[in-house]
């Protein structure tokens, strides 16, 4: 019988250990895969902690199991468990840089399945970005524009992760990935929109 060299066995064991790392949220007992990328440790799943205002993608509770919940920016700021926080711009900048820079980071960050039109990523870093889509701000009865924006959209095609940083004109930044691009970038949308949350821990 032939045995693999010890260094290879140790490397394999280390990889298995990294893949199996998890964190259990003491507030509700839900467990999340986590991954260390650079100096930061990230949730490798979308947050699924129930807050009063959070919703499931497409309004379907089964989607919460797969994609986590969608949060307004105000909810997102306090949704992460103790010891974790909503990423700021520097956290996301570090993530994008570690994933190959703005032009290539989307490919490395997107999950290897679940994106439509051949939009899957390589998930090279284990971040496992999931295309949960979004929901517009809550509609105002009788306001046609708000009723349109309040609809769910983008599941399977887009991932949006809130940051902790707001703009002077009452918008908030988020990390954006889409099925048709290998890039990753930041944009800003109204704080009342519902988007995904990835919690992060560590010092940049």
Q: Which residues make up each language-model segment?
A:
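Positively charged n-region of N-terminal signal peptides that target proteins for export
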Residues: 1-5
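Bacterial N-terminal signal peptides
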Residues: 7-17
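Conserved positions within compact, well-structured domain cores
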Residues: 19-204
């Amino acid at each position: 019988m032939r045995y693999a060299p010890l260094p290879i066995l140790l490397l394999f064991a280390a990889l298995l250990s990294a893949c199996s790392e998890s964190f259990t949220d003491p507030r509700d007992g839900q467990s999340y895969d986590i991954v260390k990328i650079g100096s930061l440790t990230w949730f490798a799943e979308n947050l699924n902690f129930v807050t009063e205002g959070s919703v499931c993608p497409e309004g379907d509770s089964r989607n919460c199991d797969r994609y986590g919940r969608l949060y307004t920016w105000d909810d997102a700021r306090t949704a992460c468990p103790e010891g974790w926080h909503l990423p700021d711009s520097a956290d996301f900048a570090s993530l994008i840089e570690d994933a190959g820079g703005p032009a290539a980071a989307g490919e490395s960050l997107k999950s290897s399945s679940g994106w439509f039109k051949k939009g899957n990523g390589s998930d090279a870093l284990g971040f496992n970005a999931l295309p949960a889509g979004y929901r517009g701000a809550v509609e105002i009865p009788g306001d046609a524009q708000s009723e349109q924006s309040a609809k769910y959209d983008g599941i399977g095609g887009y991932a949006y992760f809130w940051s902790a940083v707001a703009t002077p004109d009452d918008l908030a930044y988020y990390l954006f990935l889409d099925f048709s691009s290998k890039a990753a970038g930041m944009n800003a949308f109204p704080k009342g929109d519902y988007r995904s949350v990835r919690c992060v821990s560590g010092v940049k």
